[in-house]
């Protein structure tokens, strides 16, 4: 199976297959189809927002099957002048889960002075095709101490995922094939790590409060179509701590108009 898509996200960073599994026909291996999604964007206009994100954009799903979200690459761009103060916390959410601590899949913090940032998450769990079609993932964004007039966009986020689609769970054993991201920097951070360095309020608690204020699903907005006015920035400012050690590779990015890529697609 050809698992590296040139000029795209490196699938091998998320899925660890043996040499035999890479060359065997699909009938002899449990992994049937590995895909990279199209890029989905969120334009952040508010200091705190919960937006839907399509992590399976352009991915061909199997009727009555499953899809495993093996990996996720998030790229952010601050639309600000250099050396601005403040920062942002970004949290990936599974909106199906009622308990906020179980709904948060991973969170990350970065300073506004870092103009472009990129981090990776390995969710490593599967959902049914029926659930996937309901767009179950959201992104909770909390911007702090960025002084920008209302109505403008201080931050843009782009998402691309690596996923595996399959028809049956029997003999899949995919969890044994998932590896951790091998970069030395803090590309994948659990909420505990982020809270230790930066957060006064954990993102799971922030999510619970946000849901209680707005209603869990009724007020969630599409990221790209959001035209709401940004709320007034929080005046309680704390010094931003920079994690450092970020690794940014240009060849890991996917162009805006790129198509979803099938690394290997065989009969199911």
From Swiss-Prot:
Keywords for this protein: Host cell junction, Host cytoplasm, Host cytoskeleton, Host-virus interaction, RNA-binding, Transport, Viral movement protein
Coiled-coil segments on the chain, per record: none
Subcellular location: Host cytoplasm, Host cytoskeleton; Host cell junction, Host plasmodesma
GO terms assigned for molecular function: double-stranded DNA binding; RNA binding
GO cellular component terms attached to this protein's record: host cell cytoplasm; host cell plasmodesma; host cytoskeleton
Listed GO biological process terms: transport of virus in host, cell to cell
Biased composition (Polar residues): 225-237
Keyword Transport belongs to the record: yes
InterPro entries: TMV_movement (IPR001022), Viral_movement (IPR028919)
Signal peptide as annotated in the record: none
Chain residue ranges for the region called Disordered: 216-238
Location (main, coarse): host cell
Subunit structure: Binds to host RBCS at the plasmodesmata; this interaction seems required for viral systemic movement. In resistant plants, interacts with host MBP2C at host microtubules; this interaction prevents virus cell to cell movement. In resistant plants, interacts with host resistance (R) protein (e.g. tomato ToMV resistance protein TM-2(2), AC Q71BG9) at the host plasma membrane; this interaction triggers host defense responses leading to programmed cell death.
Known role: Transports viral genome to neighboring plant cells directly through plasmosdesmata, without any budding. The movement protein allows efficient cell to cell propagation, by bypassing the host cell wall barrier. Forms a ribonucleoprotein complex with viral RNA. Binds microtubules and modulates microtubule stability. Can bind double-stranded DNA. Triggers host hypersensitive defense reaction in incompatible plants harboring resistance (R) proteins.
Family: Belongs to the tobamovirus movement protein family.
Name recorded for this polypeptide: Movement protein
Species the sequence originates in: Tobacco mosaic virus (strain Korean NC 82) (TMV)
Gene of this entry: MP
């Amino acid at each position: 199976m050809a698992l590296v898509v040139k000029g795209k996200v490196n699938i091998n960073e998320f899925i660890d297959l043996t040499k035999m599994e890479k060359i065997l026909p699909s009938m002899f291996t449990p992994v049937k189809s590995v895909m990279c999604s199209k890029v989905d964007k969120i334009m952040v206009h508010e200091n705190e927002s919960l937006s839907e994100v399509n992590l399976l954009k352009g991915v061909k799903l199997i009727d009555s099957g499953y899809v495993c979200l093996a990996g996720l690459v998030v790229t952010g761009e601050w639309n600000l002048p250099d050396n601005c103060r403040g920062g942002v916390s970004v949290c990936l959410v599974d909106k199906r889960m009622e308990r906020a601590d179980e709904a948060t899949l991973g969170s990350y913090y970065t300073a506004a002075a870092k103009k472009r940032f990129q981090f990776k998450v390995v969710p490593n769990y599967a959902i049914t095709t029926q659930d996937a079609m309901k767009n179950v993932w959201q992104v909770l964004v909390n911007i702090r101490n960025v002084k920008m007039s209302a109505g403008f966009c201080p931050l843009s986020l782009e998402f691309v995922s690596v996923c595996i689609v399959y028809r049956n769970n029997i003999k899949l054993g995919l969890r044994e094939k998932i590896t951790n991201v091998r970069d030395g920097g803090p590309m994948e951070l659990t909420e505990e790590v982020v809270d230790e360095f930066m957060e006064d309020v954990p993102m799971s608690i922030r999510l619970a409060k946000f849901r209680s204020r707005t209603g869990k699903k009724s007020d969630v907005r599409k990221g790209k179509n959001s035209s709401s006015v940004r709320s007034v920035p929080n005046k309680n400012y704390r010094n931003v701590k920079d994690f450092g050690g970020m690794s940014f590779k240009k060849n890991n990015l996917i162009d805006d108009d790129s198509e979803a890529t099938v690394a290997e697609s065989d009969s199911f």
